[in-house]
Amino acid sequence: MRVLAIRHHDIDTVGFIGEAFEARGASLAVHLFPDEGPLPALDGVDYVIVFGAVSSVNDPDPWIAEELAWLRGADHAGVPVLGICFGAQALCAALGGRVERMPDKEVGWFTVESADEDAVPAGPWLEFHEDHCLLPAGATVLARNDSAVQAFRIGRHLAVQFHPEVDGPLLKRWLDAHTDAETRKLGIDPDQFLADTIREEPASRARADRLVATALAIRDS
């Protein structure tokens, strides 16, 4: 299985999600977009993962419109996608939904109400977002909480608002990209956030593995 992972920041990693695909024998190629140039052709690609971004899907940057068009192309070509955070919102917008700003950012560890906890565990999951999805026609909600739709499927695609890939080192890079004051303004103690993330790593790895199993089951359904 050839998997193409799209990152948007050089500090990001594929984390537990990439690990779970590789454990299933996947060959993983990673493309940093837009820094490494145009999105690759999908010839020979069996699965796509689109990770998070600081940008909003509604920002006017040309690369965002390019990515939405590319995702529509993946859908038309029958290439399944796992969208994570920005990737989930991009998939939503590409397929006819809308993305809107939330009243408050959702940052930290949160549980979700899952329609099927074997498919999408209740968590907790790490969240780091301020936009949310208004789903396109044909999408099915798999999990939600009071803030947002947290997981949905549409066609052969799976999208999750949370970050199942994140381990301690990745979160530390994210926190280091913000000042301590910026993080605390969100009501987050960065040291505690990092400690909680490190403590959750074994369970996070297992939840990410379960999510990849669900993504592949949706692909095959």
Name each region found by the language model.
Residues 18-82:
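Flexible gly/pro-rich beta->alpha loop and the following alpha-helix that scaffold active-site loops
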Residues 74-98:
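Catalytic nucleophile loop
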Residues 6-8, 33, 86:
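Cofactor-binding loop segments of dinucleotide-utilizing enzymes, especially the Rossmann-like FAD-
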Residues 2-24:
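Short, charged N-terminal beta->alpha structural module
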Residues 5, 100, 114-221:
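Amide-donor transfer/coupling interface in amidating biosynthetic enzymes
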